[in-house]
Amino acid sequence: MESPGPGGPPLVQAPYTVLLLPLGTSRQDPGAQNFFLWLQMMQALEREQDALWQGLELLEHGQAWFADRLRETQQRQLQLGALGEDFLMDLHSETDAPLLTRIQKVNACLHSLIHKELSKHRKGVTQSTGEVVSQAPPGPKGPTLV
């Protein structure tokens, strides 16, 4: 079990001990079966937690990467605006279409994952409270029109 660091991945791995007690000699022993199922669920939850930590770290790196590409694109846009009609003379005016396609695929995958989770959460809230939640998630706004 890991304890999260301030605003980031886990800093310290907390030790723990697993104690296995014999519950009987039969595989059909209900206590042994329940324990085995519990242990399997705990392991699955630990794997999910590890994957979530990895995803969070990737998102942090991804956010920095996206911010850098956004700044570069804005700079290129300003340069292109400054060139005016002479933009054909600039060799750096070419866009990177394959990169754009990959970015759009990543955005679509993230949107799909987040939208499915928000839908599940909202259904749970609606069922438990009886009212519909219609609030947009916080965060930066979409693309800016020029």
UniProtKB/Swiss-Prot annotation:
Pfam families: Suppressor_APC
Positions of transmembrane segments: none
Bias kind Pro residues: ranges: 137-146
Region (Disordered): 121-146
Protein name: Suppressor APC domain-containing protein 1
